Amino acid sequence: METGTSRVKRGMAEMQKGGVIMDVMNAEQAKVAEAAGASAVMALERVPSDIRAAGGVARMADPTVLEEVMKVVSIPVMAKARIGHIVEARVLEALGADYIDESEVLTPADEVFHIDKKDFTVPFVCGAKDIGEALRRINEGASMLRTKGEPGTGNIVEAVRHMRLIQSQIRKIQSLAKDELYAEAKNLGAPYDLVLYIHENGKLPVVNFAAGGVATPSDAALMMELGADGVFVGSGIFKSDSPEKFARAIVEATTHYKDYKLIAEVSKNLGAPMKGIEISKLHASERMQDRGW
Protein backbone atom coordinates (compact mmCIF):
# COMPACT_ATOMS: atom_id res chain seq x y z
CA MET A 1 0.00 0.00 0.00
CA GLU A 2 1.32 3.43 -0.96
CA THR A 3 2.59 5.46 2.00
CA GLY A 4 0.91 8.79 2.59
CA THR A 5 -2.45 7.77 1.12
CA SER A 6 -5.57 8.88 2.95
CA ARG A 7 -6.26 5.28 3.96
CA VAL A 8 -2.79 4.78 5.45
CA LYS A 9 -2.84 8.12 7.30
CA ARG A 10 -6.31 7.50 8.74
CA GLY A 11 -5.19 4.01 9.74
CA MET A 12 -2.25 5.49 11.65
CA ALA A 13 -4.60 7.85 13.49
CA GLU A 14 -7.01 4.97 14.21
CA MET A 15 -4.15 3.23 16.07
CA GLN A 16 -4.31 5.98 18.70
CA LYS A 17 -7.94 5.12 19.55
CA GLY A 18 -8.60 4.78 23.27
CA GLY A 19 -5.29 6.43 24.10
CA VAL A 20 -4.03 9.55 25.86
CA ILE A 21 -1.76 11.98 24.01
CA MET A 22 0.26 14.18 26.38
CA ASP A 23 1.95 17.54 25.81
CA VAL A 24 5.65 17.42 26.76
CA MET A 25 8.30 20.13 26.73
CA ASN A 26 11.47 18.06 27.03
CA ALA A 27 12.93 14.54 26.99
CA GLU A 28 12.38 14.05 30.73
CA GLN A 29 8.66 14.77 30.51
CA ALA A 30 8.39 12.54 27.43
CA LYS A 31 9.84 9.63 29.42
CA VAL A 32 7.34 10.26 32.23
CA ALA A 33 4.48 10.28 29.70
CA GLU A 34 5.60 7.05 28.04
CA ALA A 35 6.09 5.29 31.40
CA ALA A 36 2.58 6.37 32.43
CA GLY A 37 1.09 4.72 29.35
CA ALA A 38 0.62 7.63 26.93
CA SER A 39 -0.17 6.43 23.40
CA ALA A 40 1.75 9.39 21.93
CA VAL A 41 3.34 12.68 23.00
CA MET A 42 3.06 16.19 21.61
CA ALA A 43 6.48 17.89 21.66
CA LEU A 44 6.31 21.65 22.18
CA GLU A 45 8.26 24.49 23.81
CA ARG A 46 5.42 25.73 26.02
CA VAL A 47 2.17 24.12 27.13
CA PRO A 48 -1.03 26.03 26.24
CA SER A 49 -1.41 27.65 29.68
CA ASP A 50 2.10 29.15 29.36
CA ILE A 51 1.37 30.29 25.79
CA ARG A 52 -1.81 31.94 27.06
CA ALA A 53 0.03 33.62 29.96
CA ALA A 54 2.94 34.86 27.82
CA GLY A 55 0.81 36.34 25.03
CA GLY A 56 2.54 37.56 21.87
CA VAL A 57 3.02 35.32 18.83
CA ALA A 58 3.26 31.57 19.44
CA ARG A 59 5.13 29.64 16.74
CA MET A 60 6.36 26.14 15.95
CA ALA A 61 8.76 24.83 18.62
CA ASP A 62 12.53 24.80 18.14
CA PRO A 63 13.33 21.63 16.11
CA THR A 64 15.74 20.59 18.90
CA VAL A 65 12.77 19.96 21.23
CA LEU A 66 11.23 17.54 18.74
CA GLU A 67 14.56 15.79 18.09
CA GLU A 68 15.31 15.37 21.82
CA VAL A 69 11.88 13.86 22.48
CA MET A 70 12.09 11.54 19.46
CA LYS A 71 15.41 10.16 20.74
CA VAL A 72 14.07 9.00 24.10
CA VAL A 73 10.62 7.51 23.40
CA SER A 74 9.37 4.65 21.25
CA ILE A 75 5.77 5.93 21.04
CA PRO A 76 4.70 8.33 18.23
CA VAL A 77 5.73 11.98 18.54
CA MET A 78 3.46 14.79 17.35
CA ALA A 79 4.30 18.46 16.86
CA LYS A 80 2.30 21.63 16.28
CA ALA A 81 2.38 23.95 13.26
CA ARG A 82 0.52 27.23 12.92
CA ILE A 83 -2.75 27.25 10.99
CA GLY A 84 -1.92 27.84 7.33
CA HIS A 85 1.87 27.73 7.82
CA ILE A 86 2.90 25.35 5.03
CA VAL A 87 6.64 25.67 5.71
CA GLU A 88 6.41 24.92 9.45
CA ALA A 89 4.49 21.77 8.51
CA ARG A 90 7.07 20.81 5.86
CA VAL A 91 9.88 21.33 8.38
CA LEU A 92 8.14 19.07 10.93
CA GLU A 93 7.61 16.43 8.25
CA ALA A 94 11.30 16.66 7.27
CA LEU A 95 12.31 16.25 10.94
CA GLY A 96 10.35 13.00 11.11
CA ALA A 97 7.33 13.97 13.24
CA ASP A 98 4.83 11.10 13.27
CA TYR A 99 1.83 13.47 13.19
CA ILE A 100 1.41 17.22 12.71
CA ASP A 101 -1.21 19.21 14.63
CA GLU A 102 -2.33 22.27 12.65
CA SER A 103 -3.15 24.01 15.88
CA GLU A 104 -5.19 26.99 17.02
CA VAL A 105 -3.04 27.02 20.19
CA LEU A 106 -0.34 28.70 18.08
CA THR A 107 -0.93 32.09 16.47
CA PRO A 108 -2.44 31.51 13.00
CA ALA A 109 -0.14 32.29 10.09
CA ASP A 110 -3.04 32.49 7.64
CA GLU A 111 -6.52 33.69 8.57
CA VAL A 112 -8.07 32.58 5.26
CA PHE A 113 -6.51 29.25 4.27
CA HIS A 114 -5.69 26.11 6.19
CA ILE A 115 -2.87 23.83 4.99
CA ASP A 116 -3.63 21.45 2.10
CA LYS A 117 -2.99 18.34 4.17
CA LYS A 118 -3.58 15.89 1.31
CA ASP A 119 -0.24 17.01 -0.12
CA PHE A 120 1.73 15.57 2.84
CA THR A 121 2.89 12.03 3.65
CA VAL A 122 2.55 12.61 7.41
CA PRO A 123 -0.97 12.50 8.94
CA PHE A 124 -2.49 15.70 10.33
CA VAL A 125 -4.55 16.36 13.45
CA CYS A 126 -6.93 19.36 13.46
CA GLY A 127 -9.33 20.94 15.93
CA ALA A 128 -13.07 21.32 15.32
CA LYS A 129 -15.85 22.79 17.44
CA ASP A 130 -18.73 21.70 15.20
CA ILE A 131 -19.48 19.30 12.35
CA GLY A 132 -18.96 21.94 9.64
CA GLU A 133 -15.39 22.63 10.82
CA ALA A 134 -14.78 18.90 11.21
CA LEU A 135 -15.84 18.09 7.64
CA ARG A 136 -13.91 21.03 6.16
CA ARG A 137 -10.72 19.83 7.86
CA ILE A 138 -11.31 16.24 6.70
CA ASN A 139 -11.87 17.52 3.16
CA GLU A 140 -8.46 19.26 3.35
CA GLY A 141 -6.89 15.94 4.35
CA ALA A 142 -7.01 15.78 8.18
CA SER A 143 -6.64 12.17 9.37
CA MET A 144 -7.65 12.84 12.97
CA LEU A 145 -9.78 15.43 14.73
CA ARG A 146 -10.00 16.77 18.27
CA THR A 147 -12.39 19.13 19.98
CA LYS A 148 -10.90 22.59 20.27
CA GLY A 149 -12.20 23.12 23.81
CA GLU A 150 -10.48 26.15 25.29
CA PRO A 151 -6.78 25.21 25.61
CA GLY A 152 -4.73 26.15 28.64
CA THR A 153 -7.73 26.88 30.87
CA GLY A 154 -8.09 23.61 32.76
CA ASN A 155 -11.83 24.11 32.17
CA ILE A 156 -13.63 21.21 30.46
CA VAL A 157 -16.85 23.09 29.63
CA GLU A 158 -15.93 24.04 26.04
CA ALA A 159 -14.64 20.56 25.13
CA VAL A 160 -17.94 19.15 26.44
CA ARG A 161 -19.88 21.70 24.39
CA HIS A 162 -17.97 20.83 21.20
CA MET A 163 -18.23 17.06 21.66
CA ARG A 164 -21.96 17.19 22.43
CA LEU A 165 -22.60 19.52 19.49
CA ILE A 166 -20.75 17.29 17.02
CA GLN A 167 -22.56 14.18 18.29
CA SER A 168 -25.96 15.89 18.03
CA GLN A 169 -25.17 17.15 14.51
CA ILE A 170 -24.24 13.60 13.48
CA ARG A 171 -27.62 12.39 14.76
CA LYS A 172 -29.39 15.19 12.88
CA ILE A 173 -27.67 14.29 9.59
CA GLN A 174 -28.64 10.65 10.09
CA SER A 175 -32.29 11.62 10.57
CA LEU A 176 -32.53 13.61 7.32
CA ALA A 177 -33.99 12.24 4.09
CA LYS A 178 -31.33 11.63 1.45
CA ASP A 179 -32.59 14.46 -0.77
CA GLU A 180 -32.23 16.89 2.16
CA LEU A 181 -28.48 16.26 2.46
CA TYR A 182 -27.56 18.71 -0.32
CA ALA A 183 -29.12 21.62 1.55
CA GLU A 184 -27.54 20.43 4.82
CA ALA A 185 -24.10 20.29 3.14
CA LYS A 186 -24.63 23.85 1.91
CA ASN A 187 -25.73 25.03 5.39
CA LEU A 188 -22.67 23.42 6.99
CA GLY A 189 -20.23 24.65 4.34
CA ALA A 190 -19.14 21.03 3.99
CA PRO A 191 -18.72 18.65 1.02
CA TYR A 192 -21.80 16.57 0.14
CA ASP A 193 -19.89 13.26 -0.02
CA LEU A 194 -18.76 13.64 3.62
CA VAL A 195 -22.27 14.57 4.76
CA LEU A 196 -23.53 11.47 2.91
CA TYR A 197 -20.88 9.35 4.69
CA ILE A 198 -22.20 10.49 8.08
CA HIS A 199 -25.80 9.88 6.98
CA GLU A 200 -24.95 6.30 5.99
CA ASN A 201 -22.48 5.43 8.77
CA GLY A 202 -23.59 7.49 11.76
CA LYS A 203 -20.05 8.64 12.54
CA LEU A 204 -17.17 10.76 11.28
CA PRO A 205 -14.81 9.11 8.77
CA VAL A 206 -11.84 9.80 11.09
CA VAL A 207 -11.26 9.49 14.85
CA ASN A 208 -12.29 12.44 17.04
CA PHE A 209 -10.39 12.98 20.31
CA ALA A 210 -11.20 15.30 23.20
CA ALA A 211 -8.88 18.24 23.85
CA GLY A 212 -8.88 21.65 25.47
CA GLY A 213 -9.39 21.83 29.23
CA VAL A 214 -8.90 18.20 30.35
CA ALA A 215 -7.47 18.68 33.87
CA THR A 216 -8.49 15.64 35.96
CA PRO A 217 -8.98 11.87 35.53
CA SER A 218 -12.75 12.47 35.78
CA ASP A 219 -12.54 15.04 32.96
CA ALA A 220 -10.86 12.46 30.73
CA ALA A 221 -13.47 9.81 31.60
CA LEU A 222 -16.29 12.29 30.98
CA MET A 223 -15.07 12.99 27.46
CA MET A 224 -14.84 9.26 26.71
CA GLU A 225 -18.37 8.85 28.08
CA LEU A 226 -19.55 11.56 25.66
CA GLY A 227 -18.13 9.68 22.68
CA ALA A 228 -14.49 10.78 22.34
CA ASP A 229 -12.14 8.26 20.73
CA GLY A 230 -9.31 9.30 23.06
CA VAL A 231 -7.95 12.29 24.95
CA PHE A 232 -5.31 15.00 24.49
CA VAL A 233 -3.97 16.45 27.74
CA GLY A 234 -2.08 19.71 27.40
CA SER A 235 -1.31 21.73 30.50
CA GLY A 236 -3.15 19.42 32.91
CA ILE A 237 -0.39 16.91 33.66
CA PHE A 238 2.85 18.86 34.04
CA LYS A 239 1.07 21.81 35.69
CA SER A 240 -0.24 19.50 38.44
CA ASP A 241 1.51 18.84 41.78
CA SER A 242 2.53 15.25 40.96
CA PRO A 243 2.89 14.75 37.18
CA GLU A 244 3.86 11.03 37.28
CA LYS A 245 0.83 10.03 39.37
CA PHE A 246 -1.41 12.40 37.47
CA ALA A 247 -0.36 11.03 34.08
CA ARG A 248 -0.98 7.42 35.17
CA ALA A 249 -4.36 8.37 36.65
CA ILE A 250 -5.48 10.06 33.40
CA VAL A 251 -4.49 6.99 31.37
CA GLU A 252 -6.33 4.64 33.75
CA ALA A 253 -9.45 6.82 33.75
CA THR A 254 -9.45 7.04 29.94
CA THR A 255 -9.05 3.28 29.49
CA HIS A 256 -11.57 2.32 32.19
CA TYR A 257 -13.92 5.28 31.85
CA LYS A 258 -16.97 3.33 33.01
CA ASP A 259 -15.26 1.92 36.12
CA TYR A 260 -16.16 4.67 38.57
CA LYS A 261 -14.63 2.95 41.61
CA LEU A 262 -11.30 2.72 39.80
CA ILE A 263 -11.54 6.40 38.79
CA ALA A 264 -12.21 7.27 42.45
CA GLU A 265 -9.16 5.21 43.47
CA VAL A 266 -6.74 6.76 40.96
CA SER A 267 -8.02 10.25 41.80
CA LYS A 268 -6.92 9.99 45.45
CA ASN A 269 -3.95 12.01 46.75
CA LEU A 270 -3.01 13.48 43.38
CA GLY A 271 -2.37 16.89 44.86
CA ALA A 272 -3.86 20.02 43.35
CA PRO A 273 -4.70 19.98 39.64
CA MET A 274 -3.66 22.93 37.48
CA LYS A 275 -5.29 26.26 38.38
CA GLY A 276 -8.28 26.75 36.07
CA ILE A 277 -9.68 29.78 34.25
CA GLU A 278 -13.38 30.64 34.05
CA ILE A 279 -14.25 30.91 30.32
CA SER A 280 -16.51 33.96 30.80
CA LYS A 281 -13.46 35.87 32.10
CA LEU A 282 -11.71 35.51 28.72
CA HIS A 283 -11.80 38.41 26.28
CA ALA A 284 -12.96 37.47 22.74
CA SER A 285 -9.37 37.91 21.48
CA GLU A 286 -8.14 35.35 24.05
CA ARG A 287 -10.45 32.57 22.85
CA MET A 288 -8.19 30.17 20.94
CA GLN A 289 -11.16 28.04 19.83
CA ASP A 290 -12.32 30.82 17.48
CA ARG A 291 -9.14 30.65 15.39
CA GLY A 292 -9.58 28.90 12.04
CA TRP A 293 -12.94 28.46 10.29
UniProtKB/Swiss-Prot annotation:
* GO biological process per UniProt: amino acid metabolic process; pyridoxal phosphate biosynthetic process; pyridoxine biosynthetic process
- Keyword Lyase applies: yes
UniProt keyword annotations, A-Z: Lyase, Pyridoxal phosphate, Schiff base
Q: Which CDD domains match?
A: pdxS (cd04727)
Pathway per the UniProt entry: Cofactor biosynthesis; pyridoxal 5'-phosphate biosynthesis
Q: Return the Gene3D superfamilies for the record.
A: Aldolase class I
**PANTHER family hit by this protein:** PYRIDOXAL 5'-PHOSPHATE SYNTHASE SUBUNIT SNZ1-RELATED
Q: What is this protein called?
A: Pyridoxal 5'-phosphate synthase subunit PdxS
